[in-house]
């Protein structure tokens, strides 16, 4: 079956804190399943903890490379978390719009993250010391321009207001978005703490992002899986390579890409 054989190739753009590694795919089992149904897949290869603007440059160059090597006119971007912000910047500020047919954002904090707002209240010296440790760590794993301090501050609700004013949607690009929510703090042991903080001030969330923050363009809905454990930020990219009752993440992406194909993208 070629139900995922879209007119334009797929560009998968990862979120913060990860790289596109050969032996550990950020997207878990998803790319293999998409390829099985005919998808032509590429990766953003941007840095783990660089700023939005820096990563956007990587994405812009990757789009140019794909178009040049394949002869295609455009790409379909599917971006998770911060990757959605990086992609929006590349499209609207760096001139990638003519080469992008669609942008699908998954659990992207378009309107910021309240957990980051609280984290930014840490003493300046302490925050910069923590940032220095992260920068050193990620520089050893391939980042040439890690900037934990700036990158994390770009997730604040205040920064998101400025970002959205400066990075307007590009005419001619189709924007759509998805969100998910955890049932409770036990749904994902990796995200129980930020989940509780955000739950107290903003309500339901995926452990990092609320549905309200994830909405951008045509909002396709919130995946809740209410009768079971809910779906966390990491679950949406098959981080743990686990199957959850009531939600098949690979099937979700197959349907997503199938719909893009049906729209002519």
Predicted regions and their residues:
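Active-site catalytic motif of lipid deacylating hydrolases and related acyltransferases
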Residues: 2-75
């Amino acid at each position: 079956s070629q139900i995922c054989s879209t007119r334009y190739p797929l560009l998968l753009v990862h979120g913060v804190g990860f790289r596109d590694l050969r032996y550990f795919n950020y997207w878990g089992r998803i790319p293999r399943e998409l390829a099985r149904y005919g998808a032509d897949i590429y990766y953003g290869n941007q840095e783990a903890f660089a700023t939005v603007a820096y990563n956007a440059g990587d994405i812009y160059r990757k789009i140019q490379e794909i178009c040049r090597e394949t002869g295609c006119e455009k790409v379909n971007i599917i971006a998770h978390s911060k990757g959605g912000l990086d992609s929006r910047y590349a499209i609207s500020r760096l001139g990638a719009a003519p080469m992008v047919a669609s942008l699908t954002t998954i659990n992207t904090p378009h309107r910021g993250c309240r957990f980051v707002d609280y984290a930014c209240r840490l003493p300046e010296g302490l925050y910069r010391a923590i940032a220095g440790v992260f920068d050193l760590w990620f520089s050893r794993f391939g980042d040439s321009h890690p900037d934990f301090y700036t990158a994390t501050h770009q997730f604040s609700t205040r920064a998101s207001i400025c970002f959205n004013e400066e990075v307007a949607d590009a005419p001619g690009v189709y924007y759509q978005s998805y969100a998910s929510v955890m049932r409770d703090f036990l749904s994902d042991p990796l995200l129980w703490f930020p989940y509780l903080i955000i739950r107290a001030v903003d309500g339901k969330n995926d452990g990092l992002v609320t549905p309200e923050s994830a909405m951008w363009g045509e909002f396709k809905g919130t995946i809740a899986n209410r009768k079971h454990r809910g779906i966390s930020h990491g679950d949406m990219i098959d981080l743990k390579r686990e199957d959850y009752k009531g939600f098949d993440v690979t099937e979700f992406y197959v349907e997503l890409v199938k719909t893009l194909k049906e729209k002519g993208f």
